[in-house]
Amino acid sequence: VVALAGVMLALFNLLADIGIGPAVIQNKTLTAEDMNSINTFNSYQGLVLGVAFFFSAPFIAEYYGNPQVKLVCQIMSVNILMGCVNAVPNNILYRQQRFKLITIISLCSQFIAGAIAISMAFHGCGPISLVLPSAIISIPTMFVLRYITKVHFVWRIDWAPLKRIFSFSVFQFLANVVGYFSRN
């Protein structure tokens, strides 16, 4: 069930990853205000894709002929949203070469998610125990990343920084598309 939903999740994650992360790492001229605009754009994109994945869940379940896929996809839609919301702060840490901190955040998140998953599995939650913990843990991770990087949402997106990184991010996105379809 999770593997079936994972196939569609990979496609939506491909659309979510338009090369902004590597562009944030590569472009050293981006200011804090630029990062806030890029982060807000990426978050809105994640919201649109997450909602689209959520409402596509019944059709995905019908396509696979497995009604359990619906709930799994709906829970995974949170991962799409949070992946986009956390992308810029996470890549700022990569840009700053704070690998130890990235590892600590990742290990703590995975440990907590693993403990939740094991507990859910022991309580008979089935395939939900594989997907719900990562959705749950992504929310506090967002707050930790925001606190550390000081990235925040802005009401008005400045399109100039997005235009500056576009030439790099579009080729990164195209490379990801080629890689995705060569593997699938």
Q: Model features per residue range: what roles?
A:
Residues 11-15, 51, 55, 66-92, ...:
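Alpha-helical transmembrane segments of multi-pass membrane proteins
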Residues 23-32, 82-105, 128, 149, ...:
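Membrane-interface junctions at transmembrane-helix termini in multi-pass inner-membrane proteins
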Residues 25, 57, 61-62, 94, ...:
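Membrane-water interface at transmembrane helix exits
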Residues 34-35, 69, 127, 161-169:
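Primarily residues marking transmembrane-helix entry/exit sites
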Residues 100, 143-184:
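Interhelical loop/hinge segments that connect adjacent transmembrane helices in multipass membrane
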Residues 4-58, 71-77, 100-101, 106:
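Membrane-water interface segments that mark the loop-to-transmembrane alpha-helix transition
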Residues 21-22, 57, 90-94, 117, ...:
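Interfacial helix-capping/hinge residues at the ends of transmembrane alpha-helices
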Residues 1-3, 58, 62, 70, ...:
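Membrane-interface helix-loop junctions in multi-pass transport and translocation proteins
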